[in-house]
A protein has these predicted regions:
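ATP-grasp fold ATP-binding core
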Residues: 21-30, 60-62, 119-121
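Structural motif
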Residues: 26-27, 56-59, 80-81, 117, ...
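A short, polar/proline- and glycine-enriched secondary-structure boundary/capping micro-motif
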Residues: 78, 92-98, 242-247
């Protein structure tokens, strides 16, 4: 993995230069943390612990890719379609006043509001061709998780006939600016050139589909790839023009805690 200081002092400024040069509006830069155990990692035990602590998240295990995702990429039941993208993050605090202040600072942050707006506008644009009606909450709401607060906006719509299947919707929406960037093609190239890690299945769509084309898919974040005695953990941040490198590094540390705290209990 790349050292935190190099990630903060070299990679973030490199991407911010590209943003300032108008090459791209937003890029999601990820970090990798590798844990090594002295025996095979017990996936079932980890899933149980994730379930206990993350009641509102989708708990998943796909052949050793495990996690507790709070972010709904898209669901489709009949003609009804729903998404709940998350972009914009603040760290949670044990002390109530500090935690309330963190929430309020997130709501007041112009940087986080812009990062969120980029994601919502992109998602509405991509969903619109499939829908006869689509709507989004006028303002983002706070989603509070055990280690972080997020800005989230619920998007709902009615599919045009013949209704697209969940897999068609997933294909159209992945990867969103919440895990890649905007514009998508340019952001993905920058990630490939600069990020310097193998994301494996991190941030990929995870979910289920039935024979009628209904289903529900989350974004594969707050996740780890288990390979024998090793666990590869991932956390990403959305970089925009106003991003501050140390704050972004702190944000990855908070996001790692979902999985890291679970592994450290073993």
């Amino acid at each position: 993995p790349i050292k935190p200081e190099i990630w903060r002092d070299k990679k973030i400024p490199e991407i911010k230069d590209l943003i300032h040069d108008k090459k791209v509006k937003k890029v999601v830069l990820a970090r990798e943390l590798i844990l090594t155990a002295n025996k095979e990692i017990p996936i079932e035990t980890i899933l149980e612990k994730l379930k206990e602590k993350n009641a509102t998240s989708m708990i998943f295990n796909i052949d050793g890719f495990i996690g507790a995702s709070p972010e709904l990429l898209v669901s489709r039941f009949g003609n009804a379609v729903r998404a709940n993208p998350l972009a914009g993050t603040a760290t949670r605090h044990r002390e109530e006043n500090a935690d309330n202040q963190s929430r309020q600072e997130l709501l007041d942050s112009t940087k986080d509001a812009y990062e969120h707006k980029v994601t919502i506008e992109w998602l509405l644009k991509e969903l619109l061709p499939f829908c006869s009606f689509i709507d989004a909450d006028p303002e983002p709401r706070i989603m509070s998780l055990p280690h972080v607060h997020h800005l989230g906006t619920e998007v709902t719509g009615q599919l045009s006939q013949p209704a697209a299947s969940i897999l068609e919707l997933v294909t159209a929406l992945h990867p969103t600016p919440a895990v890649a960037g905007d514009p998508q093609t340019e952001a993905l190239k920058i990630i490939k050139d600069i990020e310097g890690i193998d994301r494996r299945r991190y941030a990929g769509p995870v979910g289920w589909v039935d024979s009628s084309g209904n289903g529900e898919f989350a974004v594969g974040i707050r996740s780890a790839e288990i390979l024998g005695k090793k666990a590869h953990l991932y956390a990403g941040v959305g970089l925009v023009a106003d991003s501050e490198p140390q704050s972004e590094l702190n944000e990855t540390r908070s996001k790692f805690q979902t999985m890291l705290s679970t592994f450290l209990e073993l």
